[in-house]
Regions:
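Conserved PLP-binding catalytic core of the aspartate aminotransferase-like
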Residues: 139, 520-525, 531-564, 614-629
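PLP-dependent aspartate aminotransferase-fold enzymes
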Residues: 292-399
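Active-site core of PLP-dependent enzymes with the aminotransferase class I/II
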Residues: 384-390, 402-428
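Active-site PLP attachment segment
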Residues: 53, 90, 449-481, 492-499
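N-terminal glycine-rich, Lys/His-bearing helix-loop that initiates the first secondary-structure elements
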Residues: 196-303, 420, 576, 587, ...
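Structural signature of PLP-dependent enzymes
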Residues: 504-528
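Conserved donor-nucleotide/metal-binding helix-loop-beta segment in metal-dependent transferases, i.e.
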Residues: 60-85
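PLP-dependent enzyme catalytic core of the Aspartate aminotransferase-like
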Residues: 508-510, 518, 569-629
Length: 629
């Protein structure tokens, strides 16, 4: 009997098995225990022999031996995996129907329901027995969970073809004379699927079909907690995220990478979007909301007169660069900050792969970026006006693009000095506010410093989770967009600007920037407080609403990993940065710090000599962006 799920992905498998003349029973994807109960009941089974689909080589002779032993021993449950001595992939479980039914009544946790037999194996109500191999060969991996496993199994099967009745002893003989056959899947942990969360399982699948595994470097699990990060979400509301195993996790981390300053699923924003979905998101005609949004943003920034929209921050910055170059007729650009992934930006690394080390990540290779862009993008460090002056004195610059504030704010009137230089030399000054916008002011952070750019780019928080970015600028610059080609179909969809208009309404009504700035300052103070009480040296940085800390230690990354690991066990998504949302109430934050304090005590123990790596359940997280806000 094949007991598989009702998921349509198994339709083809079910059809093949039925055509071969075998019975197929289908049931729940996640409640596999109930699926087994249904399959056993449908066939009037007294005894169930469980062979999972990842064990293609399982030996019929071994099954017969174990079944005879099971019947003569009159026990409830028998396996050959507790402890394992046979190769991974030769797993056999045998149990009474009565025991299966009883375990189905007892087992309540999602883990027990998914993995069928944990209750049978661990509950004292059931009698057990284990079948041991004459020689322990449990180090061999002959199961099929990953592509590497399939390659190994195929290599062995091909040696026996066309036979399909080869035994375990024959396989061991082939491996002895051809040890290279089993090198392809070395290093994969036995039964890792039994302890791996659903997110990690999907992440392993993702890496087979998506280069890098996902679309955003900042969301890769190795940036947080390698091998254990939940990786994917099923739903999100407020500051709670549910993973694929339906665990509710409080997000005290980066809130969608800064996209949701009003919290996930804000009712007013979502209601506006839902109406747009009902009324229609696209048509041959333009959506009026793009006009309303342009007028709204221009009114908020009196120096600006025109706007263009896109759907990602990288696009917005690329649009701005194109317009600035068209307006000035000059191709060279000076940058200070992180401005996306496009060719124009990564061209900075054509001279050396470390040019962007202090702006984004060290070691970025500009593969695929045309060599003829070399020298078109020049960098200067934040708060180093002398470096910008040197660039201007030796290059014909068309534009300066920079973040208004980085991990630390401007010193010695930096922004005004940059403005003065740009004006003096006829250079277009652009402020990248994709991350900093709407965090500390209603609009661009530059408003707080009283310095007006020629162009500014906004994103992330503008749509509270919906894709919308904006390029604002003076008419004298923006009209150059008509002298080049900047156009894209999905920049005309309606959901983005609708969400932005609703988001701006809520922000203005609640003064959201004041709320998140105040709470961000409080979070920073709490980090400093528990660090001081535990005798730990930390450094804090970033805008209050984009606050972060790092332990001043050579083990800073290990400590970041430890924080994430221990707080995940307490149902928090956490690390060393918090992108604050209005839904982060004092009650939520105080509860978080009450749980975090013991982790800081652990860090102190490690600073005093305890091995931090001995506390980690997996590898250390990767280093992330140099720029956090």
């Amino acid at each position: 009997v094949l007991a598989t799920s009702t998921n349509e992905i198994n339709d083809q498998l079910s059809a093949v098995v039925e055509n071969l003349g075998f019975q197929v029973i289908r049931g729940s994807e996640n409640d596999v225990l109930q699926r087994y109960v249904d399959a056993a009941a449908a066939t009037n089974a007294d005894v169930v022999i469980r062979i999972t689909g990842d064990c293609p080589f399982v030996d019929p002779q071994l099954i017969d031996e174990m079944l005879g032993d099971f019947i003569s021993s009159n026990i409830d449950y028998m396996s050959n995996t507790d402890p394992p001595t046979f190769p991974d992939g030769f797993d056999i479980e045998i149990f009474k129907m009565s025991a299966l039914l009883q375990s189905a009544e007892i087992a309540t946790s999602p883990f027990e329901r998914e993995h069928v037999t944990p209750c049978l194996r661990t509950n004292s109500l059931f009698s057990h027995k284990n079948k041991a191999a004459v020689v322990d060969v449990s180090h061999l991996r002959l199961t099929v969970d990953e592509q590497r496993d399939l390659d190994v199994v195929r290599g062995i099967a091909n040696l026996f073809a066309p036979r399909t009745d080869f035994s375990l002893s024959e396989i061991l003989g082939v491996i002895t004379t051809n040890p290279h056959l089993i090198t392809g899947n070395l290093g994969i942990e036995r039964n890792e699927g039994a302890t791996m969360n659903s997110g990690q399982k999907l992440w392993k699948r993702a890496q087979q079909v998506i280069p890098g595994g996902n679309m955003l470097l900042s969301k890769r699990p190795d940036q947080f907690l390698p091998e254990h990060w939940p990786a994917y979400f099923s739903k999100a509301l407020g500051c709670t995220v549910w993973d694929l195993d339906d665990n509710a996790l409080t997000d005290m981390s980066i809130m969608g990478i800064g996209t949701n300053s009003l919290g996930y699923g804000h009712p007013e924003v979502d209601a506006a979007v839902a109406k747009t979905v009902r009324d229609g998101n696209m048509s041959t005609l333009n959506c009026p909301e793009e006009v309303y949004l342009a007028e709204r943003l221009v009114a908020m920034h009196p120096w600006a007169e025109m706007a263009r929209f896109a759907r990602t921050g990288g696009e917005a910055n690329a649009i701005a660069i194109r317009i600035a170059r068209a307006a000035t007729g000059k191709s060279k650009v000076a940058i200070c900050g992180y401005h996306g992934w496009h060719d124009w930006y990564l061209a900075a690394n054509l001279g050396t792969e470390n040019t962007l080390a202090g702006h984004l990540l060290p070691g970025l290779e500009p593969n695929g970026v045309p060599e003829n862009l070399r020298g078109s993008v020049l960098t200067f460090n934040y708060n180093r006006i002398d470096e910008l002056e040197a660039l201007i004195s030796t290059h014909e610059l068309g534009a300066i693009m920079m973040e208004v504030s980085r991990n630390f704010g401007p010193e010695d009137d930096l922004l005004q000095k940059v403005r003065n230089l740009a004006t003096k030399h006829g250079i277009v000054l652009m402020f990248d506010e994709c991350t900093s916008g709407f965090r500390q002011t209603f609009g661009g952070l530059h408003k707080m410093f009283g310095v007006e750019p020629d162009m500014a780019m906004f994103g992330k928080a503008l749509g509270n989770g919906y894709a919308i970015t904006a390029v604002l600028g003076k008419r004298s610059v923006m009209e150059a967009a008509q002298n080049t080609f900047i156009s894209s179909t999905f920049w005309t969809e309606r959901i983005g600007p609708t969400a932005a208009l609703a988001t701006l309404d809520v922000m203005e009504q609640t003064k959201s920037w004041e709320i998140i700035t105040k709470m961000g300052s409080y979070i920073t103070e709490q980090w400093q407080s528990i660090a001081k009480s535990n005798g730990i040296a930390i450094k804090t940085s970033g805008l209050p609403a984009l606050t972060s800390f790092s332990v001043d230690s050579k083990f800073a990354l290990e400590y970041k990993t430890l924080v994430t690991q221990e707080m995940l066990k307490k149902s928090y998504l956490a690390g060393t940065s918090v992108y604050v949302a209005t839904v982060h109430t004092k009650e939520i934050v105080d509860r978080f710090f009450a749980e975090l304090e013991p982790v800081f005590a652990l860090i102190k123990e490690c600073e005093d000599g305890r091995d931090v790596k001995s506390l980690l359940d997996g590898p250390t997280c990767s280093s992330s962006f140099k720029r956090l806000n």
